[in-house]
C-alpha cells in the first residue's frame, strides 16, 4: 500500500505483506519492523481512507479503521483503532481474505470517506460516517477524475483503494 499515513514523514509511505518495515517515498527505511496493524496485529495493507479529519490517511482492513500514529486529539484512549465495525452489528466484507467493504468513498462530499458494509445475516446494510470533527476543507473527492475512476474500478473489478489525481498530505493541507 502507498499512502501518507505518517505526519512526521513528508510525502507518501509504503509497505507490503512481503517486505520488512515501512519506507518513505524515496526508499529510505522509516521503521524496520513496525507495520501499521489492526485486529489480531495483522499488517494493514488493504486500503487507505480519509476518516479522522486529519490530513493523513488511515488504514481500512479487517473490519476496522486504524491510524498509524495515535492522535490523542482524535482518539482519547490514545490507541490506534478508530472504529471496529463489528461493534455496530456489521461484520460482512466482500472477501474473507481482504475484508473489503461493499463500498467506501467520499459520497457525502466533505473529503472524509464513508464505508458501507453488510450485516452478518445479509439483510441490512450499514453506512458508516466519521464523527471526528475537522477544520480541513477539500473539494468533494468525486470531482477529481482519478478518484472517480478509482471508485468505478473498485466496484467493477479487482478491489483496490482510491487514489486522488493530486497529492494531499500532512505538509500540504492547512486548516481553514
Regions found by a protein language model. Give the residues of each.
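Beta-propeller-forming repeat regions
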Residues: 1-176
Amino acid at each position: 500500500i502507498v499512502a501518507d499515513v505518517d505526519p512526521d514523514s513528508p510525502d507518501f509511505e509504503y509497505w507490503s505483506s512481503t517486505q520488512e518495515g515501512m519506507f518513505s517515498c524515496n526508499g529510505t527505511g522509516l521503521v524496520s519492523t513496525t507495520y501499521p496493524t489492526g485486529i489480531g496485529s495483522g499488517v494493514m495493507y488493504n486500503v487507505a481512507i480519509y476518516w479522522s479529519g486529519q490530513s493523513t490517511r488511515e488504514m481500512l482492513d479487517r473490519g476496522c479503521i486504524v491510524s498509524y500514529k495515535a492522535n490523542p486529539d482524535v482518539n482519547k484512549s490514545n490507541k490506534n483503532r478508530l472504529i471496529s465495525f463489528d461493534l455496530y452489528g456489521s461484520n460482512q466484507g466482500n472477501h474473507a481474505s481482504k475484508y473489503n467493504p461493499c463500498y467506501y468513498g467520499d459520497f457525502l462530499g466533505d473529503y472524509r470517506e464513508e464505508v458501507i458494509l453488510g450485516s452478518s445475516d445479509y439483510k441490512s446494510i450499514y453506512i458508516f460516517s466519521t464523527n471526528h470533527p475537522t477544520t480541513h476543507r477539500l473539494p468533494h473527492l468525486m470531482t477529481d477524475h482519478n478518484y472517480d475512476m478509482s471508485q468505478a474500478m473498485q466496484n467493477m473489478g479487482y478491489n483496490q483503494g482510491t487514489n486522488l489525481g493530486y497529492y494531499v498530505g500532512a505538509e500540504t493541507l492547512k486548516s481553514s
